[in-house]
């Protein structure tokens, strides 16, 4: 297989093992853990051209490239990462990591608990965005990266980029926060709870210890994903793609799949339930719920951002109702009030929340322009 000139080509996942205990926000301590990660491009001698990509709820470390020549699925942000792409691997050293609690190689509920010899399951502790950032900082130390040229993330990944700028202000030159929010709204917490209930009430869940029973709570995962997927799309986007199209010529007057949108959602749910871990889904949604950096400052986001040193790009999409532009503007206003440097882009799109994964021309142009400036400043 011949790869396009702007592809990172064949890649391989790596694993970093840590035996220094990690104290979590919940009060639990992980004595040892592993992080699965990938890198693209080359770290320069000054070690100042590194970019960290933080993934969203269902993401992972495989950001770009393919694992073998006949691999049909490129990394989840392959359209944005590669030579000559906005996140240009000819100029930057790019790192993608699967977060703690994940199900793609990093230590999580499906990993073996060394204390028992069995999967962690329900015993795996809740993890938070600050916990992830602490573990990512240890990975950065291992890779010889003292300061990121940029930390970039969309949705839950954007929360991590924001947390990086606050927790390690001296280690982040730029933070790109895309389609995100400074905390979840009550409606978003409600969506997450309904999704969790779908999993928790699945008879095959077994209190989180389904591994020992040789089953998977597919029904719950399927419903959780179907609900989530609706919130990632826009009404206009769904209408344009599916409308009221029927799979057959007319109504069947039953409860089987009739509309194309029903078929699409069930396909997405079926696919996801075969790839993702139910306990990880619960952990990721709780990490979303708990993220609220202003909480420690009596709800004052300006005060929470007072120590940041990074320059910011905040980006939002007009049709995103899960993380609406108003939520991004909250971050912008707080940064301005705190006297920080921030650029804001609001992109016209019909793709809803998922637009941050797409290649709408204004979005690509915004990312390219901002990161070109970052690269030029490094070269100066």
Swiss-Prot record:
An example molecular function term from Gene Ontology annotations: homoserine O-acetyltransferase activity
Residues annotated to bind substrate: 225, 354
GO biological process: homoserine metabolic process; methionine biosynthetic process
Protein's pathway: Amino-acid biosynthesis; L-methionine biosynthesis via de novo pathway; O-succinyl-L-homoserine from L-homoserine: step 1/1
Subunit structure: Homodimer.
Purpose of the protein: Transfers a succinyl group from succinyl-CoA to L-homoserine, forming succinyl-L-homoserine.
Assigned protein family: Belongs to the AB hydrolase superfamily. MetX family.
Entry protein name: Homoserine O-succinyltransferase
Source organism of this protein record: Laribacter hongkongensis (strain HLHK9)
Gene coding for it: metXS
């Amino acid at each position: 297989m011949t790869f396009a000139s702007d592809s990172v080509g064949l890649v391989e996942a790596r694993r970093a093992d840590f035996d220094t205990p990690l104290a979590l926000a919940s009060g639990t301590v992980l004595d040892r853990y592993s992080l699965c990660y990938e890198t693209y491009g080359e770290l320069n001698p000054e070690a100042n051209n590194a970019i960290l990509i933080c993934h969203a709820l269902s993401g992972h470390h495989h950001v770009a490239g393919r694992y073998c020549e006949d691999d049909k699925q490129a990394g989840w942000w392959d359209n944005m990462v590669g030579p000559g792409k906005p996140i240009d691997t000819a100029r930057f050293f790019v790192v993608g990591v699967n977060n703690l609690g994940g199900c793609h190689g990093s230590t999580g509920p499906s990993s073996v608990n060394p204390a028992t010899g069995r999967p962690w399951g329900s015993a795996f502790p809740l993890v938070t965005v600050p916990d992830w950032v602490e573990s990512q900082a240890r990975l950065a130390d291992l890779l010889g990266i003292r300061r990121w040229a940029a930390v970039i993330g969309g949705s839950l990944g954007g929360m991590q980029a924001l947390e990086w700028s606050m927790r390690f202000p001296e280690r982040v030159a730029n933070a790109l926060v895309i389609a995100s929010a400074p905390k979840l709204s009550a409606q978003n917490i409600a969506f997450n709870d309904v999704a969790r209930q779908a999993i928790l009430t699945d008879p095959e869940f077994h209190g989180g210890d389904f591994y020992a029973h040789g089953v998977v709570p597919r029904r719950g995962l399927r419903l959780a994903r179907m609900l989530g997927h609706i919130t990632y799309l826009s009404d206009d986007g769904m209408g344009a793609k599916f409308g009221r199209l029927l799979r057959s010529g007319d109504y069947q007057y039953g409860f089987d799949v009739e509309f194309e949108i029903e078929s699409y959602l069930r396909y997405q749910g079926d696919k996801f339930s075969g790839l993702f871990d139910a306990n990880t889904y619960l952990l990721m949604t709780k990490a979303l719920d708990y993220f609220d950096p202003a909480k420690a400052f009596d709800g004052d986001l300006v005060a929470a951002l007072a120590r940041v040193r990074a320059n910011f790009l905040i980006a939002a999409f007009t049709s995103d109702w899960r993380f609406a532009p108003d939520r991004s503007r909250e971050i912008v206003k707080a940064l301005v009030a705190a006297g920080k440097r921030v650029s804001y882009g609001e992109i016209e799109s019909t793709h809803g929340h998922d637009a941050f994964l797409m290649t709408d021309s204004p979005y690509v142009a915004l990312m390219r322009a901002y990161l070109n400036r970052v690269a030029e400043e490094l070269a100066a």
